[in-house]
Amino acid sequence: MDPFLVLLHSLSGSLSGNDLMELKFLCRERVSKRKLERVQSGLDLFTVLLEQNDLERGHTGLLRELLASLRRHDLLQRLDDFEAGTATAAPPGEADLQVAFDIVCDNVGRDWKRLARELKVSEAKMDGIEEKYPRSLSERVRESLKVWKNAEKKNASVAGLVKALRTCRLNLVADLVEEAQESVSKSENMSPVLRDSTVSSSETP
């Protein structure tokens, strides 16, 4: 899986509705009004920018500028990690889990303990997580997912996480995770075409 596409999907899943509206406003001079009207998610917008060669794997200046305008320092940190090589160093399956973790953290709040119990996180571990993050539900979710992943090691998978979500009746979140995997796969399948078109256009005299 292309780590850059994984990064874009991760960023998209963490954008609020207001964030998306602001991004569309910021891109109004780069993207036609017709295309912007079709944009329903951050990934939609990133895909358009990729197609127009305004955004490339090796040139993330525009992406950094957009995230800075949103004042989303957390997302800028993800971009920093990617550029530092953290994302590309991830083993197979790690990138898929990272996307799933981001979605779960953004959409599971007060039900985090129910999910943690289903993932076999001990009560003692949960108590420690609560003490460590007394004010952040999303960080509690992320920490509990890390505990599960560390315990499962190579057996930790998106499929296992989705199964736990559905057992907890968090079906909407499970659907979002599955849709994210499908969307990343489709984007990845399209990426060679984008690369070929980029090369062709650059070779045209």
UniProtKB/Swiss-Prot annotation:
Pfam families: Death, DED. Residues 181-205 are annotated as: Disordered. One of its GO terms (molecular function) is tumor necrosis factor receptor binding. GO terms for biological process: apoptotic process; behavioral response to cocaine; cardiac muscle tissue development; cellular response to mechanical stimulus; death-inducing signaling complex assembly; defense response to virus; extrinsic apoptotic signaling pathway; extrinsic apoptotic signaling pathway in absence of ligand. Residues 97-181 form the Death domain. The modification Phosphoserine is found at residue 191. GO terms for cellular component: CD95 death-inducing signaling complex; cell body; ripoptosome. CDD domains: Death_FADD, DED_FADD. Apoptotic adapter molecule that recruits caspases CASP8 or CASP10 to the activated FAS/CD95 or TNFRSF1A/TNFR-1 receptors. The resulting aggregate called the death-inducing signaling complex (DISC) performs CASP8 proteolytic activation. Active CASP8 initiates the subsequent cascade of caspases mediating apoptosis. Involved in interferon-mediated antiviral immune response, playing a role in the positive regulation of interferon signaling. This is FAS-associated death domain protein. It comes from Mus musculus. The gene is Fadd.
